[in-house]
Design a protein with these regions (language model features):
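Short, acidic, metal-binding catalytic loop of nucleotide-sugar glycosyltransferases
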Residues: 2-13
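A conserved acidic beta->alpha catalytic loop
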Residues: 3, 20-30
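Conserved donor nucleotide-binding strand/loop of the catalytic core
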Residues: 14, 28-63
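Donor-binding/catalytic cores of nucleotide-activated saccharide
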Residues: 51, 72-184, 191-203
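Catalytic core of nucleotide-sugar-dependent glycosyltransferases
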Residues: 186-195, 201-229, 245-274
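Amphipathic alpha-helical repeat scaffolds of TPR domains
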Residues: 236-248
Length: 313
């Protein structure tokens, strides 16, 4: 939270909207002194409606020309935002996409004076160029991007209420619908790393359904008019990445075959024509998902067992 106010910006020129999603911990108490010290902070309280609803409500309340959506547990690098905002205001770009660092808690604690060096440089691209050249489907992070508010509202971009993985369809839709964009390797955020194993361990049917909904909404983007073939192919490949993530989580965290079947049926109802055709791996996976899901999981379990056996040779 404090890193937001270390950006070299005049507080009269921007607003900070805090959406309290019915937190049960002491988060709001911890930042009471920060709220009291800054007149440009607005607090919105909601009853545990999910991060996606919190973001939608924050966007609806925003008045500024550009919107940044940092996560509460991540950090902005000191004085990293102003060059991006200046370029955004100068070019009226729909999106300004920056780079970030991944660090663990111990690394963050030891990095007391982390800043960019030199000047930020930018490359102008269209949204579809950005999609093809820069979007990693495993890193659909909305907090690394400045969004022009009129672009979000004009294109009716919203986060799917009540689900996790909402960044995936939102980021894909934003890139595909954007006009002028600016890309920079300037570092904006520090992404707090270290909870990946916990995410796998806590995966359950609700999260599986959420991922299915995210896959379904991303799949519907294929209906956009005049998508170049290269864009359509990458979109299909990106959806396959999300589908593979679903399979991985189900394999390691959903043990009951009836639960796995229910999740697949849930996905089939939302994407009846889900099919992947780029390469042998996609074709085989797609065929087994559609016609032999139990056999597919059996082979995946055997492969998991074989590759995890200790080598005594």
């Amino acid at each position: 939270m404090e890193s937001i106010f270390k950006q070299g910006l005049d507080e009269d020129d921007y607003e900070v909207i805090i959406v309290n999603d019915g937190t049960k911990d002491r988060s709001m108490e911890v930042i009471e002194d920060i709220i009291a010290a800054h007149a440009n902070i607005t607090v919105i309280n909601q009853e545990n409606l999910s991060l996606s609803v919190a973001r939608n409500n924050g966007i609806a309340a925003a008045k500024g020309e550009y919107i940044l959506m940092p996560d509460s547990d991540d950090l902005l690098i000191e004085n990293s935002l102003k060059p991006l905002l200046d370029k955004a205001l100068e070019t009226k770009a729909d999106l300004v996409v920056a780079d970030f660092l991944e660090m663990g808690d111990e690394q963050i604690a030891q990095s007391t004076d982390l800043q960019n060096s030199g000047e930020a440089t930018f490359v102008e691209k269209t949204g579809k160029q950005l999609f093809l050249e820069d979007l990693n489907p495993r890193q659909c992070y909305v907090w690394r991007t400045l969004y022009r508010r009129a672009f979000i509202t004009g294109k009716k971009l919203t986060f799917v209420p009540g689900i996790r993985y909402q960044d995936v369809p939102f980021t894909h839709e934003a890139y595909l619908k954007a006009g002028k964009c600016m890309r920079t390797h300037w570092l904006l955020n520090i992404y707090r790393r270290g909870h990946e194993s916990a995410a796998t361990a806590s995966f359950n049917k609700k999260k599986a359904h959420d991922l299915c909904i995210a896959i379904a909404k991303t799949w519907r983007l294929r209906k956009m008019k005049k998508l170049p073939l290269s864009v359509r192919q990458k979109l299909d490949d990106d959806i396959f990445v999300s589908f593979s993530l679903l399979i991985y989580f189900m394999l390691y965290s959903v043990k009951d075959f009836s639960d796995r079947e229910e999740i697949f049926n849930f996905l089939r109802k939302r994407v009846p024509k889900l099919k992947f055709t780029h390469g042998v791996k996609q074709r085989v996976t797609s065929m087994m998902y559609r016609f032999m899901p139990h056999v597919y999981f059996f082979f995946r379990l055997v492969f998991k067992w074989v590759t995890s056996k200790p080598n005594f040779g």
